[in-house]
Structure formats: C-alpha cells, structure tokens
Swiss-Prot record:
Organism: Burkholderia pseudomallei (strain 668)
Gene: miaA
Cofactor: Mg(2+)
Cysteine disulfide links: none
Designated name of the protein: tRNA dimethylallyltransferase
Xref: NCBIfam families: miaA (TIGR00174)
Coiled-coil ranges per UniProt: none
Record function comment: Catalyzes the transfer of a dimethylallyl group onto the adenine at position 37 in tRNAs that read codons beginning with uridine, leading to the formation of N6-(dimethylallyl)adenosine (i(6)A).
Amino acid sequence: MSARNAASARTVACLLGPTASGKTAAALALAARRPIEIVSVDSALVYRGMDIGTAKPTRDERAAVPHHLIDIVDPADAYSAAEFRADALRLVAQIAARGRTPLLAGGTMLYYRALTQGLNDLPAADPDVRATLDADAARDGWPALHARLAGIDPATAARLAPNDSQRIQRALEVYLLTGQPMSALLAAPPRDDDAAAGLRFVPVALEPSERAVLHARIAARFDAMLEAGFIDEVERLRRRDDLHLGLPSMRCVGYRQAWEYLDGCTDYRTMRDKGIFATRQLCKRQLTWLRAMPERIVVDCCAPDATVRAVDALERVLDGRAPA
C-alpha cells in the first residue's frame, strides 16, 4: 500500500497470538471500553459442535459481545482461506456501517495472511482427488506420500513432517490439479484485487517472553478441557457416520489424539501427552508466522498486566496513535 493510500485507509485492529496467550481476555476487556464486534480468525472455531477442544468463547461471552465466524460450518465440511477472506472483508464493512468497531482476533496465521496479502492462484479442494490420496495413504502411509511429494515439490516437502497429512495432501492435490508445485504457485505474486485496498490492518501480537510459561498454560488448559468433557465431545462426533480423521475438522489439535484414544490406539496418559505436545507444536508454528511480521506491535503475554497492555496497544491503533 502506498503512503498516500495508507493515509486514507481505514485502520482495522487485529489481535493475534498463539494458543493460550490470552487473546479472548484482551478482546473482551477491549469490548468493555468500546463498541466492538469480534471477527474470529480461527480455523477451528468455525465448526459447530466442537466447543470444548477449540476453547470456543462461552455463550455468556458471545452474548455480551457480538462474535462472527464461529459455528458457521458443519464438521463434515471444509472452510477455505478464500472463504474466510471474503467473509471477513464483508463483515468488516458491515460492522463499520453499523457504527461499531471490528476487531479481528485469533491465531490462524494462514487466514490472516490471505486477508492482508491476498490469495495466490491455488485451486479449490477437489473431493475426488482427496479421496484418491486418502486411499493411497491408507494403503501406503503418509510418509510414503511425503516421499512422493519430495519428488515433485522438494521445497514444500522439506518444510513438512512426514506425518503432516493435511498439508501433504493439499500439496499433492495442488500438483495433481495444476501440474505445478505448490511452492511455485505460492511464490507467484498474489492476485490483484481491490477488496481490501481501503483497509490498513495493524496487528497487535501477544507473544511469550518465556516459552515455558506458555507451555505450562497449554498443559493446564488441555487438562481443563479433559475435565470439562472433551472426550465425551469427541465421542459424540465419532458416532457420526460422515466424520473421519481425514477431514480438516478432525485434524484440529486435540481431536485426532482423543479420537485415536477412543479407537483404542493409545492409553489416556499417552493421549493427554500427545495432545499437549501437538498444541505446543501449533504454538511454535504460530510464533514463527508472527515473528515474520515486522509491522506487528508486540505485547508480552507472560506479563502480569498483559491484558491491560494489549488493550492499551489496541486503543492506540484504533485512535491512530500506533506507528504507521
């Protein structure tokens, strides 16, 4: 965005951070001071019936402050970054038209990147191609498909773990549909599109000064989810004939581990440990994305007054007092 366009653009405050960094508390604290509406930037919160394992805002919290892009998709269906971008831009405009302030809040950095930087020419998901790849994985295993990917797109394969089924499948799907490696398509300039041209997104990032503190929070939160009935929630989902571990919804952190426990593949303690480890790995990826944003305003989420600091940073953004 040019300096002239930036000066005339409407500022949109964004509250980003890894799992368990205190985003919900900060967003609700800001809502006590300003007439905001929260637009979720979270790929897990879109799914209905997945409340405990996603740490979804409670009914009381959602009644107190309008929330958007929560409970909008059935777990049997997919929801893409392109759909998120279109929905978020529409909501930002509608909220502003009502005389209220939109606040984007969440930790799905792929969504945030799609929103702020536009979309590359990646094809939509193809159910037939995915079914074929799922069948191949069931027969040969995901490490074998990872090796297949390494032969056609070594750059993408190098950044994926051999058991990262969701991303391996997507990279192979893109190649099968386009004949081009995903890494090449992502390296191309995003499509020109003026849908967000009048907006200036300013990220406030909750990041830990001590990773051990965040890890302790993650463990405590996972234990609290288990106490709140997370296993029962997954059991209800597992009883549905149309849900399986290959779906994006069931790849959400914690759900796969609980499902495998219910299948008898692991014991309870192993399930808990794997769920916490997977959440920590997600946190690591989220922080990697955040630290690649030089424009972000960092708030230490380990500080005792982190919520107050985050609200102050967001208010400076909204009042035009943040660095341009």
